[in-house]
Amino acid sequence: MLRQLLATARRLLLPLATPKRCLSSKPNGLDKSEYSTPPEVIDYEDPEGLPVPEYPVRPDEPLATRKQRLLYQSRKRGMLENDLLLSTFVAKYLKDFDEDETALYDKLINGVSNDWDIYYWATETKPTPPEYDTDIMKLLKQHVKNTERVQRIRQPDL
């Protein structure tokens, strides 16, 4: 009895479990024309009454300590895109920054309240505001273009 029940259930349910091939008039079933142009960026402005805490200024911080803090903050942004871009950027350039360049980089990554803004500016999806359009931002944009075609699939080792 149990054997008959299982055989009937298998016969009825097996066709439902097997994958079916979809037939399409397009080769490979893909229409790549819809992916050739990037979609428009949907970006919402922050509400007026939204309190954004000011980042504390550290005027007496030694340069070596500041660079260590910026290295950590560049690796731990909260969004993978910026983690990869900024961590590879600081691995390549931060050690050669002087005090002024380090301060500009500090202002760039800590003065902006939205990480997506940094990403859009660096990828040149949105125009960079004048207060952040510095030599450091130009260097970051050049780094993001990746003219050397370096693979950036993970953060560099510490």
Swiss-Prot record:
<comment type="subunit">
    <text>Interacts with the flavoprotein subunit within the SDH catalytic dimer.</text>
</comment>
<keyword id="KW-0496">Mitochondrion</keyword>
<dbReference type="InterPro" id="IPR028882">
    <property type="entry name" value="SDHAF2"/>
</dbReference>
<comment type="similarity">
    <text>Belongs to the SDHAF2 family.</text>
</comment>
<dbReference type="InterPro" id="IPR005631">
    <property type="entry name" value="SDH"/>
</dbReference>
<dbReference type="GO" id="GO:0005759">
    <property type="term" value="C:mitochondrial matrix"/>
</dbReference>
<protein>
    <recommendedName>
        <fullName>Succinate dehydrogenase assembly factor 2, mitochondrial</fullName>
    </recommendedName>
</protein>
<dbReference type="InterPro" id="IPR036714">
    <property type="entry name" value="SDH_sf"/>
</dbReference>
<dbReference type="GO" id="GO:0018293">
    <property type="term" value="P:protein-FAD linkage"/>
</dbReference>
<dbReference type="GO" id="GO:0006121">
    <property type="term" value="P:mitochondrial electron transport, succinate to ubiquinone"/>
</dbReference>
<keyword id="KW-0143">Chaperone</keyword>
<dbReference type="GO" id="GO:0034553">
    <property type="term" value="P:mitochondrial respiratory chain complex II assembly"/>
</dbReference>
<comment type="function">
    <text>Plays an essential role in the assembly of succinate dehydrogenase (SDH), an enzyme complex (also referred to as respiratory complex II) that is a component of both the tricarboxylic acid (TCA) cycle and the mitochondrial electron transport chain, and which couples the oxidation of succinate to fumarate with the reduction of ubiquinone (coenzyme Q) to ubiquinol. Required for flavinylation (covalent attachment of FAD) of the flavoprotein subunit of the SDH catalytic dimer.</text>
</comment>
<dbReference type="GO" id="GO:0005739">
    <property type="term" value="C:mitochondrion"/>
</dbReference>
<dbReference type="Pfam" id="PF03937">
    <property type="entry name" value="Sdh5"/>
</dbReference>
<feature type="transit peptide" description="Mitochondrion">
    <location>
        <begin position="1"/>
        <end position="23"/>
    </location>
</feature>
<keyword id="KW-0809">Transit peptide</keyword>
<dbReference type="GO" id="GO:0006099">
    <property type="term" value="P:tricarboxylic acid cycle"/>
</dbReference>
